[in-house]
A protein has these predicted regions:
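Glycine-rich beta-alpha junction loops
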Residues: 26-28, 176, 203-208, 255-256, ...
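Short beta-strand-to-loop capping motifs
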Residues: 58, 204, 294-298
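Alpha/beta catalytic cores of group-transfer enzymes, especially the acyltransferase/condensing modules
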Residues: 144-196, 283-285
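Active-site rim beta-loop-alpha module in soluble metabolic enzymes
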Residues: 201-262
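Glycine-rich, charge-dense phosphate/pyrophosphate-binding loop(s)
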Residues: 240-315
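Short, conserved charged micro-motifs
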Residues: 62-65, 210, 299-306
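ATP-binding N-lobe of GHMP and related small-molecule kinases
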Residues: 2-116, 130, 134-144, 175
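Short, small-residue alpha-helix embedded
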Residues: 122-137, 289-295
Length: 315
């Protein structure tokens, strides 16, 4: 064997690949009773990853790779991908703080269906920004605090949906049941949830964009609806703190969005009525839909409802 080589390297060169991977979970936005102000992070009982994964690796130039089950549903041009926008925002924030940017390759493993109502865009945004923050913390000795990063996720979510709301990005990033508060120094507070309940989520396979789901909402509401919304939300928050499950779920109803979005979701009303009659604590639309969620007492009931939804709601 004849090899032609240069003497450019006098010693053995070892390149250490620096990388960080972050998983961001799915979430139920609104949770029926809290339009734009409540969100719940969810984790499948079978341990599968329901969410997106972003890997950040050292590179010679910035780049984006998209893989995964739903990669083909995303824009082909990297400039149109929200993960690329997250990188631009993060780098801009670094420069504002006088920090140097290093080139990275970002790989998005898109496991979440787009337009599902399970916080698909929030998963990508949170995984991207949290991944970048973890990468810089580990290898560049710099990171943004939790509040700053949460604000970045909200900014990115607003870019997608057209309005600023944290009900998906906050639980996705912070976990648990989150209540959004009108305080920029706080943004979100965790509520005590009910750990002995099961949430069944059924994604029918159709796509409903957040913007389209918002466009069908009225620009004004009746006094009765406003009072009902405020009373139900206040009662739910109070019941969470008192751990009164029966009262909490008794007010888990949506007077703001569900009455106007039902027409976007074939078979939703039929499924809602069946599940409530069959003993579900509550049934609602996850985020802007089309995913339906219902609250169950035990795993056996949850399994039974899941089978019914598989036969009657999925398309």
């Amino acid at each position: 064997m004849v090899t032609v080589a240069s003497d450019e390297f006098s010693n053995c060169e070892v390149k250490v690949q620096k990388s960080v991977s972050v998983f961001a979970p799915a979430s139920i936005g609104n949770v029926s009773v809290g339009f734009d102000v409540l969100g719940l992070a969810v984790k499948p009982v079978d341990g599968t990853l329901l969410g997106d994964v972003v890997c950040v690796e050292s590179a010679t130039e910035d780049s984006l790779v998209v893989v995964g089950a739903f990669a083909d549903k995303l824009p082909k041009a990297k400039e149109d991908n929200i993960v690329w926008s997250c990188l631009q925002l993060f780098n801009q924030a670094l420069l504002t703080q006088g920090q140097a940017c290093v080139p990275v390759q970002m790989t998005l493993d898109k496991k979440m269906p787009v337009g599902s109502g399970l916080g698909s865009s929030a998963c990508s945004v949170v995984a991207a920004l949290a991944g970048l923050n973890a990468f810089y913390s580990k290898y560049q000795d710099y990171s943004f605090d939790e509040k700053t990063l949460l604000k970045m996720t909200g900014q990115m979510e607003a870019q997608i949906s057209g309005s600023l709301h944290y009900d998906n990005v906050a639980p996705c990033y912070l976990g648990g049941l989150q209540l959004m508060v009108p305080d920029e120094d706080v943004i979100s507070r965790v509520l005590p949830g009910f750990n002995d309940c099961y949430y069944v989520m059924a994604y029918p396979g159709i796509e409903v964009s957040t913007k389209a789901a918002r466009d069908v909402l009225p620009t004004s509401y009746s006094r009765a609806d406003v009072i009902s919304y405020g009373q139900n939300l206040a009662t739910f928050v109070d019941a969470c703190h008192r751990q009164d499950k029966a009262q909490a779920f008794s007010v888990l109803t949506d007077v703001v969005a569900e009455p106007y979005r039902t027409n976007l979701l074939p078979k939703y009303q039929q499924a809602h009525d069946y599940l409530m009659t069959a003993g579900a604590h509550a049934v609602g639309i996850s985020g802007s839909g089309p995913t339906l969620f219902c609250v169950c007492d035990n795993k056996q009931q949850a399994h039974s409802f899941a089978l019914w939804l598989n036969e009657n709601y999925l398309q």
